[in-house]
């Protein structure tokens, strides 16, 4: 009995505590990411943005949270009630589950598994089911159209993201997210006399794939200019049009958690994760988790800027970009990376 408690119960409780702590930190982080998103968009449009609730509007997201929670959920009369209520739980739950393997610093992950990037990719692929369930269960044409668009869009851009991951796998030789970060200590920067610097990170050596991954991440998370799933001018709110109260909040939460997840993946795969930009003081004095958060925020800032000034694509343009531009380029980069590693004897 004592060995059972030591081997299973205590590790299980530790994982549970880590998971709860991660979810709380994520929810608070998403609240301020949303605040930053609205502030950046307002600044581009020469507006003030949220500025009433709390100092400088810092508590606006929490006010919105209480507003949604205390509203009455309305379920359409023709909707499939069970699936209708399950869909937002699936969307938010999968977005949170993907964070289990994300290392914010060395050793700072709930599960440091050897197929970490594959796990994240699999979970991200499943997130479309929440949208499809919502579109079908709402028994309305606008949510259903939004759900169909979402399925086609996510499948199209997951192909390109998959090839980006294959390229990184070839360059690193591991699917472990911690190994991917640590492999970025040596690269082009070492060759030019700046070892362990930002020039060693994959963004430079795999620059075309960095751009493809960033743009595909926008499409994967339904961010502008690829927000055709919930295009306000056509579908109002897409698959979320019939939702209100807490179910709507869960969809909204899942969407922003997925956005932050993609920013974290961009940081890990291409921007050195928690590694400092230079391997000397004072840069090395800063904890790795701080560097990780700063890089994540910088990537999100780019997400927000794209939302602010890039117009929405047409649906045919979105599909053409994914299948006729990104797919051939990413496939060529996989072959080119493999050939380079083979002929230089690096594998």
Swiss-Prot record:
Pfam families: NADHdh. It is found in: Cell inner membrane. One of its GO terms (cellular component) is plasma membrane. Disulfide bonds: none annotated. Coiled coil: none annotated. InterPro entries: NADH_UbQ_OxRdtase_su1/FPO, NADH_UbQ_OxRdtase_su1_CS. It is a multi-pass membrane protein. Its EC number is 7.1.1.-. It is an enzyme of class 7 (translocase). NDH-1 is composed of 14 different subunits. Subunits NuoA, H, J, K, L, M, N constitute the membrane sector of the complex. NDH-1 shuttles electrons from NADH, via FMN and iron-sulfur (Fe-S) centers, to quinones in the respiratory chain. The immediate electron acceptor for the enzyme in this species is believed to be ubiquinone. Couples the redox reaction to proton translocation (for every two electrons transferred, four hydrogen ions are translocated across the cytoplasmic membrane), and thus conserves the redox energy in a proton gradient. This subunit may bind ubiquinone. Belongs to the complex I subunit 1 family. This is NADH-quinone oxidoreductase subunit H.
